[in-house]
Swiss-Prot record:
Pathway: Lipid metabolism; fatty acid biosynthesis. This is Acyl carrier protein. The gene is acpP. 4'-phosphopantetheine is transferred from CoA to a specific serine of apo-ACP by AcpS. This modification is essential for activity because fatty acids are bound in thioester linkage to the sulfhydryl of the prosthetic group. Residues 2-77 form the Carrier domain. SUPFAM superfamilies: ACP-like (SSF47336). Keywords: Cytoplasm, Fatty acid biosynthesis, Fatty acid metabolism, Lipid biosynthesis, Lipid metabolism, Phosphopantetheine, Phosphoprotein. Its main location: cytoplasm. One of its GO terms (biological process) is lipid A biosynthetic process. It is found in: Cytoplasm.
Amino acid sequence: MSSIDKRIKEIVAEQLGVDEGQVTNEASFMDDLGADSLDTVELVMALEEEFDIEISDEDAEKIQSVQDAIDYITDHT
């Protein structure tokens, strides 16, 4: 696991208040980790801050799972 993957999983666990063991690459923020729409907005903001990037609203809507976040961050950093 790359350091980006690990850091994203740590942020997801922290933001959503779940155990890191639940944060798998396939985990959907809403379906598997219990996030609501506000949680996902806050999660995107935390990722923007951590990786010093700006995620457009259009792109943010496409980030639905841990793997989506990893792919986006990897492609944009």
